[in-house]
Amino acid sequence: MKSDIEIAQETKELPIEEIAAKVNLKKEDLEPYGQDKAKINWKAINRIRKNDKLGKLILVTSISPTPAGEGKSTITIGLGDAIHNQLHKNTLIALREPSMGPVFGLKGGATGGGRAQIIPMEDINLHFTGDMHALTAAIDTLAALVDNYIYQDNSLNIDPERILLKRGLDVNDRALRKITVGQGSKFNGIEHKASFAITVANELMAILCLANDINDLKARIGDMLVGYTQDDQPVYVKQLGFQGAIAALLSNALKPNLVQTLEHTPALVHGGPFANIAHGANSVMATNLALHLSDYVLTEAGFGSDLGGQKFMDFVSKHLDKTPDAAVVVATVRALKYQALGSTDKLDEENLDALKTGFKNLERHMNNMRSYNVPVIVLINRFDTDTDKELELLKELVEKQGIKAEVVTYHNEGSKGGSRAAQEVINLADSGKAELISTYNEDDDIKSKIKKIATKIYHADGVEYTDKAEEQIKELAKIGKDKLPVIIAKTQYSFSDDKKKLGAPGGFNLHVKGVSLKNGARFIVVTTGNVLDMPGLPKHPAALDIDVDNDGKISGLF
């Protein structure tokens, strides 16, 4: 089979105006970026949000990620194509924008694979419509303005060593995790320690993805916690007056981007916070617009149900015009065998015992989603090396738990690789059985929220806190911020905070190292284990395989 980029480059794209027309968007509603992508303008956004139509929302999540691959984005796109082209339903796919840094590192892109991709894949994975660059500029402008305030005046007496804002770059660069700025003479600024986070891990990315409009964006930026004064008082961006300028930098990036799949299903691709260190979902602007424009909306949550899935149900859905009508859990035979074996060496060999053992991981993810009182289905992403016996066994194991399972081949066959699965998903979404039950109550304090997520979703025995975390929790209580939702930063590879504990581990405690207020995003990040907000590059970065010819044709992107 040809590479993803070869398949994408051979596909004849439809003009973006034709894609828009499928969901009743007119030419004047668009701000085109070339022939194949466009932003939806504010006039259209404001008009669409006033209509009463609300489609069905289908959330796609998965088992715990493994090096064997799960293909969640591929399934989301293929399922959307199947609903649109095989069942002939009005459908929109809402996905996150990929971060450029990991494209050159290890993870790869987020545009699907094989015959189930969104296009133009090179643009989406690299510069796209410039949203990531706008975010990076906004992040670093804010950092520069704060440093300049301290250098020029500092009438609020901000402590340079207690600035909480990080600089940003959409590049994997471990050397920037800890730096010192303002070195040398005072002419270069006030010397203090600082750090970079990858753009998508910055609070401004979360704010962009949660804001409803420019006024909300501006208010949230103003509420961002800059740091503390020498006498322990919190300082917010609005006290310094920078929110208008930063919102101006992001006003265009706030508008969702319209593209298409290989099979010309409309897709909104907008925003991209990581799910292990942020909330892991595309913008609420895009999802809400999709709900008002189409009958069925497919969106995905980053990583497994314990990370993106939990955050979507308990946090993101509170910002949407409706909660999910159905949940899809993506699984593969290979990934479940990896959960049992802990190695990729023999995944191509039939191993029913390993599959039975690894199934415990899927079972927990299924039950996690079921605990939210939303109908659940499992889609098994078939690989060429899967045997019929393995697929039959996995289907049987799932259905013994009272949940339907369907084998799909969207990667190899596009929308034709799972029409029956698409119908089953539609049946669930139309069943009217979804009535979301949250993991915690909104008025629970920080520790109660953490404990409920840890015990109900991760299946931990309890929670342990460092002295530093205890002090930070007291600080948040002191400034009245201890009732906000919590976003737990945790490894994606395990239900625990130890990435080596595969399968469905028990007998462990969750170890909380620290908590930090993201006041503009209106949540508290709870740090566990060793989670980095600035990735590094591997020994053999994907960049070594990427090239471009003299005609501008890119190769090596997956």
Curated annotation (Swiss-Prot):
Keywords of the record: ATP-binding, Ligase, Nucleotide-binding, One-carbon metabolism
Catalytic reaction annotation: (6S)-5,6,7,8-tetrahydrofolate + formate + ATP = (6R)-10-formyltetrahydrofolate + ADP + phosphate
InterPro entries in UniProt: Formate_THF_ligase, Formate_THF_ligase_CS, P-loop_NTPase
Pathway: One-carbon metabolism; tetrahydrofolate interconversion
Protein name, entry field: Formate--tetrahydrofolate ligase 1
Species in which this protein is naturally found: Lactobacillus acidophilus (strain ATCC 700396 / NCK56 / N2 / NCFM)
Gene that this sequence comes from: fhs1
Binding residues annotated for ATP, in chain numbering: T66, P67, A68, G69, E70, G71, K72, S73
Pfam families: FTHFS
Gene3D superfamilies on file: Domain 2, N(10)-formyltetrahydrofolate synthetase, Formyltetrahydrofolate synthetase, domain 3, P-loop containing nucleotide triphosphate hydrolases
